[in-house]
């Protein structure tokens, strides 16, 4: 009987220690450090992208240039600079920015779509198809960029009209 009582007390003490340690570990440290990485919002990029998609290309370029000053490795900002310049008819500038975006991120889907559209504007569907092939290898199960560029190429081949792709 005495052995059972000792065993019971020992078990109770052990369980109590385990429970207390679990609570301490669950509480974590008392400092304010966050172990999760904090995503920094680039207001210049967001404003530039919004203006570009609303047809305000010159204003977009101003914001996007500020964005790349702050983050020269932002492939998205370079892509949108290419987009804005393409829409303004600044083809050489557009190529410069698209190529920079692809140098930073060779698998950037948006850039492959947009540079493909630029090649269509210049009546170079074969080069557009090269970027469609890139998208095909990047988007294993399909993606909007692939579908959109494919349709633009098909439309170009049907009409042979150089437009604002």
Feature map (PLM): residue ranges:
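Helix-start (N-cap) detector for alpha-helical repeat units in TPR-like alpha-solenoids
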Residues: 41, 75-76, 109-110, 142-143
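Terminal, low-structured helical/coil segments at or just beyond the last alpha-helical repeat
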Residues: 3, 28-41, 129-165
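Structural marker of alpha-solenoid helical repeat scaffolds
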Residues: 70, 104, 137-141
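Alpha-helical segment of the N-proximal tetratricopeptide repeat
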Residues: 39-70
């Amino acid at each position: 009987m005495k052995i059972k009582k000792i065993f019971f007390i020992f078990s109770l003490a052990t369980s109590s220690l385990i429970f207390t340690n679990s609570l301490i570990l669950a509480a974590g440290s008392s400092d304010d450090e966050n172990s999760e990485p904090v995503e920094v919002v680039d207001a210049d990029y967001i404003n530039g992208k919004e203006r570009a998609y609303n047809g305000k290309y010159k204003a977009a370029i101003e914001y996007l240039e500020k964005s790349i000053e702050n983050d020269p490795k932002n492939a998205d900002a370079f892509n949108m600079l290419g987009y804005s310049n393409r829409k303004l008819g600044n083809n050489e500038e557009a190529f410069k920015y698209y190529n920079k975006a692809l140098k930073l991120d060779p698998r950037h889907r948006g850039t492959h779509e947009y540079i493909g559209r630029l090649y269509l504007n210049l009546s170079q569907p074969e080069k557009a198809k090269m970027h469609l092939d890139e998208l095909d290898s990047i988007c294993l199960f399909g993606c909007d960029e692939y579908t959109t560029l494919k349709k633009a190429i098909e439309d170009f081949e049907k009409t042979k009209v150089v437009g604002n792709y």
